[in-house]
A protein has these predicted regions:
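C-terminal regulatory/oligomerization modules of transcriptional regulators
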Residues: 1-6, 25-39, 44, 56-61, ...
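Interfacial catalytic loop of ABC nucleotide-binding domains
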Residues: 9
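Short helix-coil-helix linker/hinge
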Residues: 13-18
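Pre-recognition alpha-helix immediately N-terminal to the DNA-recognition helix
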Residues: 20-22
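Short, hydrophobic-biased segments on the C-terminal half of alpha helices
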Residues: 51-52
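Short, Lys/Arg-rich nucleic-acid/phosphate-binding segment
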Residues: 64-70
Length: 113
């Protein structure tokens, strides 16, 4: 049951830290699974399983390049995450505005001393 949720939901897929690290590595460009596995300190089959999950939710694309398969980031798959976190933008903007006002008040108080 958990397997189905992981492969159909981008939030579940990126909940796994090693999958997020794979996405970070792929921001620099497409790479073969062996290179990703070595970078992450995991087995090639383990990296392949993570890549399969990421591919199934639309975060990774693969293409054949000679004898190897290259995996690349498809950031369009992060749209649901972006849209969901965007709902908190107002909260963060207001928080940063209050922090900025506080810092300005501190600066002004120091100048008056």
């Amino acid at each position: 049951m958990a397997r189905a949720a992981t492969t159909s939901d981008v939030f579940n897929a990126i909940a796994e830290p090693q999958r997020r690290e794979i996405l970070v590595l792929l921001r620099a460009g497409a790479r073969p699974v062996t290179e990703l596995a070595q970078e992450l300190g995991m087995s090639q089959p383990g990296a392949s399983k993570h890549l399969r999950v990421l591919r199934e939710v639309g975060l990774v694309r693969d293409r054949k390049a000679g004898k190897q398969r290259l995996y690349g980031l498809d950031a369009r798959g992060l749209r649901p995450v972006h849209e969901w976190t965007g709902g908190f933008e107002r909260f963060w903007n207001e928080s940063f505005d209050r922090l900025d006002e506080y810092v300005q008040d501190l600066k002004q108080a120091r100048q008056e001393d």
